[in-house]
A protein has these predicted regions:
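Conserved N-terminal phosphate-binding loop of PLP-dependent enzymes in the Aspartate aminotransferase
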Residues: 1-432
Length: 432
């Protein structure tokens, strides 16, 4: 077994001062039966813990590290920016530069506002939609996670699903009553809800590729129906591309699936590994935001120069690499092909999903299209798989509800080693 002695001690010390010993619940390795590795450093496709174990990393800081950890150009840009100061609390030219870059990649984002987290982005986008429409209700999809804002912690996936508590204590009934929930990938139920409530719904928010019930792409016609119904009822369609943005394709899910939303939320990659996110969309909606309009939103560190610099450099590096999307998608497909072959050989039912460079697996015999399907996957087999992979120095997300990520830094050798490890791990899963 892998030696996590120092990590165990660090975890015990952390629990004295932080809830669960972590600053985000899933990091505590719930139900995995081992302490979380405490990280010392990371470089490229590898991450090293305080016990000296080095792993091939498919978590990628949960998505941002698309170029790999500590990319030299990104680090150099951050260092140069830090020498000028870490924060100003005032406008800078680089904020306009990143806004222009994002608009170039996402033409549907005519104006945007920088914030510090995906949660801030989704909360602010919903407030803008309510202000723009004058309506109160919103509609989300079961199993889709949009951060920890009160109105969105209703049947959420990801960390909430891991803990078996899709609704959070502390969220008032008054807040929850304005949030409608529809099954992801169910066209008929959504259309019925819109027929009944559409004229009172300010916004429909969706992960166009669900990334918090593991990785679940949309079925044919689902996103098209969302677009048609929201247009019919004057409802704002918000794509939460905090996770799938720049991943499912460089131009996002809206380009891959040819759907133009009214608003988009971005995060993770646009901060280059530092805290940054953004929300934006149609000019007439964004003109409702203060100081131009009456919808208030602000932030001391919004547009922080270090995060914006890291984001600009990350986007420029991605743009400079020919066929960037194709390279990552091919690597991901190769890895999943190897995992599927290993599962078949071990007699383990396995469903593999991929959208660009985000991917996931389900220990299940039937196709996974929504949150209930994801919940039916074999949790015991996942645990056996996860622990075996960790023991072989493969760093995966410690929950069957989390998506995995490929980076440009992953080499053919990394993928070969990971497939080799998967053969042993699938044998362990078969015995679970």
């Amino acid at each position: 077994m892998i030696d996590l002695t120092k990590s165990k001690a660090a975890f015990e010390e952390a629990r004295k001062f932080m809830p669960g010993g972590v600053n985000s619940p899933v990091r505590s390795y719930p139900h995995m039966g081992c302490p979380p590795p405490f990280i010392a450093s990371a470089k490229g496709s590898h991450i090293t813990d305080i016990d000296g174990n080095t792993y091939i990393d498919y978590v990628g800081s949960w998505g941002p590290m698309v170029l790999g950890h500590a990319h030299p150009s990104v680090i150099a840009a951050i260092q140069k920016a830090a020498e000028r100061s870490t924060s100003y609390g005032a406008p800078t030219p680089m904020e306009t530069e990143i806004a222009e870059l994002i608009h170039e990649v996402y033409p549907s984002i005519e104006k945007l506002r920088m914030v510090n987290s995906g949660t801030e982005a989704t909360m602010s986008a919903l407030r803008a939609a309510r202000g723009y429409t004058g309506r109160d209700k919103i509609l989300k999809f079961e199993g889709c996670y949009h951060g920890h804002g009160d109105s969105l912690l209703v049947k959420a996936g990801s960390g909430a699903a891991t803990f078996g508590s899709p609704d959070s204590a502390g969220v008032t009934k008054g807040t929850a009553k304005d949030t409608l929930v529809s099954p992801y990938n169910d066209i008929d139920v959504f259309k019925k809800l819109m027929d009944e409530e559409g004229d009172e719904i300010a916004a429909v928010i969706v992960e166009p590729v669900a990334g918090n019930m593991c990785c679940v792409p949309p079925i044919d016609g689902f996103l098209e129906t969302l677009r048609a119904e929201t247009e019919k009822h004057g409802t704002v369609l918000i794509f939460d591309e905090v996770m799938c943005g720049f991943r499912t394709s460089f131009h996002g899910a809206q380009a891959r699936y040819h759907i133009r939303p009214d608003m988009t939320c971005l995060g993770k990659i646009i901060g280059g590994g530092l805290p940054a996110a953004a929300y934006g969309g149609k000019r007439e909606i964004m003109n409702c935001i203060a100081p131009d309009g009456s919808v208030y939103q602000a932030g001391t560190l919004s547009g922080n120069p270090l995060a914006v610099t890291a984001g600009i450099e990350t986007l420029k590096q991605m743009m400079a690499i020919p066929h960037f999307d194709e390279i990552l998608e091919k690597k991901t497909a190769s890895l999943l092909e190897g995992w599927k072959e290993a599962a078949d050989k071990a007699g383990v039912p396995l469903i593999c999903h991929q959208s660009g460079s985000m991917f996931g697996i389900f220990f299940s015999e039937k196709e996974v299209l929504n949150y209930p399907d994801a919940c039916e996957a074999n949790a015991s087999q996942f645990k056996a798989w996860f622990l075996s992979m960790l023991d072989q120095h493969i760093y995966l997300a410690p929950s069957p509800f989390e998506t995995l990520f490929m980076s440009y830094a992953h080499s053919d050798e990394d993928i070969e080693k990971t497939i080799k490890a998967a053969k042993t791990a699938m044998e362990a899963a078969a015995k679970a």
